[in-house]
Amino acid sequence: MAEMQDYKQSLKYETFSYLPPMNAERIRAQIKYAIAQGWSPGIEHVEVKNSMNQYWYMWKLPFFGEQNVDNVLAEIEACRSAYPTHQVKLVAYDNYAQSLGLAFVVYRGN
């Protein structure tokens, strides 16, 4: 009989969770794509122990009309600095469809 092994897994929050972790260049490309689609970026964060809850805290308001990727990246870093143990997620709101166009975790916390 085969020996049973522990199946190592991590929590999956969105589609990109199944891919290797994103580097800064790939995160920048996703933000650029969201802005090019006309979506409004926003940042959410939550404690790691509560990360499977439906509600994540908003970091400020969504950045309606934001066209500068660097401003969004700066806000992600500000959120990460303010809450170093929290998970930080980028969301992009599609105003036309009134739904999320994009959402992924950019920082998994400590």
From Swiss-Prot:
Outcome, altering Y96A: No longer binds N-repeats in CsoS2A
Domain of life: Bacteria
GO biological process: reductive pentose-phosphate cycle
Subcellular location: Carboxysome
Description of the deletion phenotype: A double ccbL-ccbS deletion does not grow in air, grows well with 5% CO(2), a high-CO(2) requiring phenotype (hcr) and forms empty but otherwise normal appearing carboxysomes. Required for growth in ambient air.
Keyword set, alphabetical order: Bacterial microcompartment, Calvin cycle, Carbon dioxide fixation, Carboxysome
Induction (record text): Produced when grown in air or in air supplemented with 5% CO(2). Part of the ccbL-ccbS operon.
GO MF assignments: ribulose-bisphosphate carboxylase activity
SUPFAM superfamilies from the UniProt entry: RuBisCO, small subunit (SSF55239)
Pfam families referenced in this protein's UniProt entry, alphabetically: RuBisCO_small (PF00101)
UniProt main location, coarse: other
Further information: The basic functional RuBisCO is composed of a large chain homodimer in a 'head-to-tail' conformation. In form I RuBisCO this homodimer is arranged in a barrel-like tetramer with the small subunits forming a tetrameric 'cap' on each end of the 'barrel'.
Function: RuBisCO catalyzes two reactions: the carboxylation of D-ribulose 1,5-bisphosphate, the primary event in carbon dioxide fixation, as well as the oxidative fragmentation of the pentose substrate. Both reactions occur simultaneously and in competition at the same active site. There are estimated to be 270 RuBisCO heterohexadecamers per carboxysome.
HAMAP family with a match to the protein in the record: RuBisCO_S_bact
Oligomeric and partner information: Heterohexadecamer of 8 large and 8 small subunits. Interacts with CsoS2. Forms a CsoS2-CsoS1-RuBisCO complex. Holo-RuBisCO interacts with the N-terminal repeats of CsoS2; binding is sensitive to ionic strength. A fusion of a single N-terminal repeat to the C-terminus of the large subunit of RuBisCO (cbbL) shows the repeat can lie between a CbbL dimer, making minor contacts to CbbS; thus each RuBisCO holoenzyme could bind 8 repeats.
Stated family: Belongs to the RuBisCO small chain family.
Name of the protein in question: Ribulose bisphosphate carboxylase small subunit
Gene: cbbS
